[in-house]
Regions:
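Conserved short alpha-helical segments that host acidic/polar catalytic motifs at enzyme active sites
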Residues: 1-243, 247-248, 256-294
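Glycine-rich phosphate-binding loops that contact phosphosugars or nucleotide phosphates
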Residues: 288-320
Length: 320
């Protein structure tokens, strides 16, 4: 919860955690702020856990509801995901054809179901009781196979009570960082999530898959070869976490503008170069009929509006 709290500055509309321990897999989610999740955890205290995953979600596919919040559970797996899966519609049709019941409108639940189908099939093909280490290895293979089918940007984490104490993850384009501690290890979209516990971090590259335990981290490339991730020491402390290591919020916002533009466009530009804005629920014909734009803002947002005015009028030929 502390780690999720340090990522609040990014904005979100729901949150949740999944925990694995002797009692099995426990998922708790809530729409709204982290206080809502804390209340849900207080009302239903989870059993002691050996590992867990958590997520603060900003709605893309599906509205800001508890059902759409992460983690999503599918069979013996719980999954969190940061990013946008561009081909989730055909994957959703595949999942539904397989008889899976979907409880949300999200692309993440579709991925969780696809991953569980592959994971279950591989376990069944093994035909015998597997050790926890063998189960973890199967989940790594499933993660590699499934992420190879995904189009878009993602950082995916999965846990299972069949291999408690293990997190399997993969990334493409979306950020994912390893925190290397003493008798504990971490994963986060930003070092701010774990800098209070360790300042030693490692980089996860594109299309890499990893297996993390409290004592070890193993990373593979897309071809299944073990790689050694680059490591570094974080030079700032937890008090600076919300500022991303910058001296001021202004510095942070200035330097993050290119990343912010890229994140905004993730999954929203198709192969033809057209923008996809499904969550706005506005027909393209309506957008084409817009003949004037009014920017309402104050403070630094007003300055951004003044800059946007020149860009919009230049490229869209619409008065602002």
């Amino acid at each position: 919860m502390d780690g999720l709290g340090r990522l609040e500055y990014r904005g979100y509309d729901s949150a949740g955690v999944a925990l694995v321990g002797p009692g099995g897999l426990n998922v708790v989610k809530a729409a709204g702020k982290l206080d809502e999740l804390r209340a849900a955890l207080s009302a239903r205290p989870p059993a002691p856990a050996t590992c867990g995953i958590g997520h603060t979600r900003w709605a893309t596919h599906g509205g800001p509801t508890t059902a759409n919040a992460h983690p999503h559970r599918a069979g013996n797996l719980a999954v969190v995901h940061n990013g946008i899966i561009e081909n989730f519609r055909p994957l959703r049709a595949e999942v539904e054809a397989a008889g899976c019941e979907l409880l949300s409108d999200t692309d993440t639940e579709v991925v969780a179901q696809i991953l569980d189908l592959d994971f279950t099939a591989r376990l069944k093909a093994a035909g015998e009781a597997l050790s926890q280490e063998a189960v973890a290895a199967v989940l790594v293979e499933s993660m590699r196979a499934v992420t190879a089918r995904l189009e878009g940007a993602f950082a995916l984490l999965a846990i299972t009570p069949l291999a408690p104490g293990v997190i399997v993850a993969a990334r493409r384009s979306s950020p994912l960082v390893i925190g290397l501690g003493e008798g504990e290890n971490f994963l986060g979209s930003d070092v701010a999530a774990f800098v209070a516990f360790t300042k030693r971090a490692a980089e996860v590259g594109d299309d890499q898959v990893l297996l993390l335990t409290d004592e070890d981290v193993t990373v593979w490339d897309a071809d299944g070869a073990v790689v050694q991730p680059a490591t570094w020491e974080v030079s700032w402390d937890a008090s600076a976490a919300v500022k991303g290591g910058y001296e001021t919020f202004m510095d942070k916002e200035i330097h993050e503008q290119p990343t912010a533009v890229g994140d905004t466009l993730l999954g929203r530009v198709d192969e033809a170069g057209d923008l996809i804005l499904d969550e706005m629920h506005i027909d393209a014909s309506v957008l084409r009929s817009v003949d004037k734009i009014i920017v309402v803002a104050c403070g630094t947002a007003a300055y951004a509006g003044h800059v946007a005015k020149y860009a919009i009028e230049h490229w869209c030929r619409i008065p602002v």
